[in-house]
């Protein structure tokens, strides 16, 4: 393991590197299958853009980006983290993208989200997490249900998906509910 920040059973999370940005990471965010439910899926990505994002994220005070890596071989298979962090209100948006097609919609997403929630509520002292997804996304609601997120709002016709405007759904997980479920 290289500089682990959080360690699970099969994966660990660490700070992203230039090598990550120059590797497969930038390709994931040009891949239609990987990005079809992401808000910025319409624009192609490049190595230079990924490196610029990495540099921005490292300097940002309201964002934490982590690389998802396999413990067995240190392979970088995804990215996750927190954005729109409000240190005063102790809240953030949470996200996870498994880019490696051999690990999509499987245990990596569950284990990654579990590690993120532990980081948010135990290490960072956050009180509320938000998860936002387009209504046509079938995967995020399943993950949210597993971890106890509750739908708290809906923005009508907000996100363009496949030529149609869809609702954006906002779900919340409060620290006290997470603690009650994980005692």
What is each stretch, according to the model?
Residues 55-67:
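A short helix-loop-beta-strand connector motif used in the catalytic cores of GNAT acetyltransferases and
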Residues 43-47, 56-59, 98-99:
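Juxtamembrane/interface motifs at transmembrane-helix termini
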Residues 33-53:
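Conserved GNAT-fold acetyl-CoA-binding loop/helix
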């Amino acid at each position: 393991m290289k500089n682990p920040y959080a360690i699970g059973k099969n994966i660990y999370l660490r700070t992203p590197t230039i090598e990550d940005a120059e590797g497969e990471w930038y390709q994931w965010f040009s891949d239609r299958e990987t990005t079809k439910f992401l808000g910025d899926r319409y624009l192609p990505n490049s190595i230079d853009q990924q490196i610029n994002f990495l540099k921005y994220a490292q300097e940002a005070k309201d964002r934490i980006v982590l690389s998802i890596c396999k413990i067995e071989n240190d392979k970088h298979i995804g990215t996750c983290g927190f954005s729109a962090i409000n240190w005063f209100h102790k809240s953030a948006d949470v996200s996870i993208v498994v880019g490696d097609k051999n690990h999509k919609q499987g245990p990596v997403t569950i284990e990654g989200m579990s590690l993120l929630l532990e980081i948010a509520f135990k290490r960072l002292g956050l009180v509320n997490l938000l998860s936002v997804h387009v209504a046509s996304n079938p995967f995020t609601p399943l993950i949210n249900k597993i971890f106890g997120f509750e739908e708290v709002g809906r923005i009508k016709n907000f996100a363009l998906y496949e030529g149609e405007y869809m609702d954006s759904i906002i779900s919340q997980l409060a620290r006290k509910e997470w603690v009650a479920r994980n005692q």
